Amino acid sequence: MIQVRHASVSDRDTIVEFQVRLAKESEGLELDRAKVTQGVQAVFDRPHSGRYWVAQSGDKVVACLLTIPEWSDWRNGTVLWIHSLYVLPECRRRDVFR
């Protein structure tokens, strides 16, 4: 069974790994792991800038995403954008992101 929770700093290295894989798989880019680590840590250091979520199967994190708030004058409220979504290849098409 998949459980979704707010990510914690202890998930940082997994999130970094997933982001490095995402860039490689989707755009063929090799990211600087140190820079990605700083970027992920920045979200934990500045919670108003966004929030990471992880999906777990048992004790294993199998997916992550980042929600980023943005003010919408059209809606007179905050909307959330989904960024940096990654699901492990072996867990894709198994309703992890549903």
Show where each model-derived region lies.
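Acetyl-CoA-dependent GNAT
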Residues: 2, 6-77, 83, 88
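Short amphipathic alpha-helical surface patches that serve as generic macromolecular interface elements
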Residues: 79, 97-98
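Conserved acetyl-CoA pyrophosphate-binding loop and the N-cap/start of the following alpha-helix
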Residues: 91-96
